[in-house]
Amino acid sequence: MSKTQKWATGIFLAPIIIILLLAVAIYLPPIQNWAVQKVTAYASEKMGMEISVDHVCLVFPLDLGVDGVKIIQPNDSIPQKKDTIADLKRAVVDVRLFPLFAKRVEIDRLDIYDLKMNTANLVHEARVKGTLALLSLESHGIDLGKETLRLDMAMIDGARLNVALSDTVPPDTTESKNFWKINLDKLDVRNSDVTVHMPGDTLQVKAVLADVKAKQGFFDLYKGQYDLASIDWKKGEIKYDNNFQPRLKGLDANHIALSDIHLGIDSLHFCSPDLSVVIRQCKMKEKSGIVLASLTGKAVMDSTRLHLHHIAMKTPTSDLQAEVAIDLNVMDEKNPGQMNADISASLSKEDLLLAMGDMPVAFRRQWPAHPLAVKAKMKGNMRHVDVSEAMMELPGAMKITAKGKADYPADMEKIKADFHLDATTYNLAFVSTLLSSDLQRMIAIPSTHAVADLKMDGKAVNVSFDVAESRGKMLGKAYYNADTEAYSANIDAKNFQIQHYVKGMNLGGFTGKAELKGKGTDFF
């Protein structure tokens, strides 16, 4: 080989050799650590933070391990104090090399161990602090060109997140569109919890995610579409606290603590405004003692209507069934939609007393032990309501049924109503406990059967009634106008035992007629 050929060959091979040496050098630990030091120093200067990495290990082709990553920035209010934005013990990622040349990413392994994080003032909407024991995922099918991503498996273990929402959020003026579509095969969340604080720490919500599994998900971030084939949440907890409200006995709407949550959901679909979900299983306990043994059913909502199908709810001693369909414009003044509801329930004394925490002890003690049966079947809106069936029965105490219709039921100036009521009372001693001691010595509530027809026209009320008690009977009509305070009554009684209602006045049976008419009298 001539000298010229040697020089030509050398010139040709030199860049190749240099590239190969650099490629090999990048897998040498000293070179890797030197490069990391240079990169972290540059990043620290540009970002105004202290960024450090203890150790890096890159194994051919793209199996990367990083240890001891720390990101620190000055505190936004105390100059001499520093905030740790991130503290990562170890991260490992194994990426296939050749798919990268086709704009595809195949991740055989991505593990993050022992992460501490604090967004400080980096995110205006909220401050997020927390720890993460392990994040592990596999992803085969990330296409950077088509903006699609498949997660074969994702697992989160030991996450503790605390989110404090901000009350002053600057408007987001950036325009960006996210076309990514994500397919999820399997997600596991273990031993984790999330706490959210509303601005000013007025409200606080904490969710414990001890064991959550989700399968077969699809998320279209551009359309805002979210689908999941199934979600199972076991050993869950939810705590809700209004921090400025006192704690009350019994069921307290301002301080709710749910535990032992087991939730199973199928066929979840959300793409605003459409929502559909099948509740396969739901059970939980509340700190007041209320136990939800089972809840099943289906909920479907779109831009115009909410439909609750075959809702079945049970506690250990109570149950409820419901079928409800509500047009979302049912409250509109002009051209309102319709609401249809068919509800039946059997409510035990144990469950009712849990909701009566502030009722007198005597009332709760004397409430009958039998379950309270409730039925309601109605349809209508704020212009017109038809009640085809309404019933409440407490065996041994009372049974009340009603049916009728009303125009403008929520407007006392325009309301027009026509209802038929049928009530039978038995032992209502527990009701007497709500009266003062003086009235308890004077008033009695005997077993009575009453039938009434009630008509309302604005604030004018007409009632015709038929009351039977013991051997006596009373028929009558009454009228009252709340605007004018005018009233009238016509009563026809036969052997009506007044002493059964008014004690200690030596009254007896009354037979006769009475007529009353006036205006502005104070009945009390």
Segments (PLM) and residue ranges:
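Outer-membrane beta-barrel pore domains and translocons
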Residues: 157, 282, 313-314, 344-346, ...
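Flexible, solvent-exposed coil segments and beta strand-coil junctions
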Residues: 68-70, 74, 115, 171-172, ...
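Transmembrane beta-strand segments that form the barrel wall of outer-membrane beta-barrel proteins
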Residues: 278-284, 305-312, 384-392, 458-467, ...
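Extended terminal
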Residues: 2-13, 20, 369, 381-385, ...
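Membrane-embedded beta-strand positions of outer-membrane beta-barrel proteins
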Residues: 110, 154, 343-345, 376, ...
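N-terminal type II signal-anchor transmembrane helix
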Residues: 1-48, 76-78
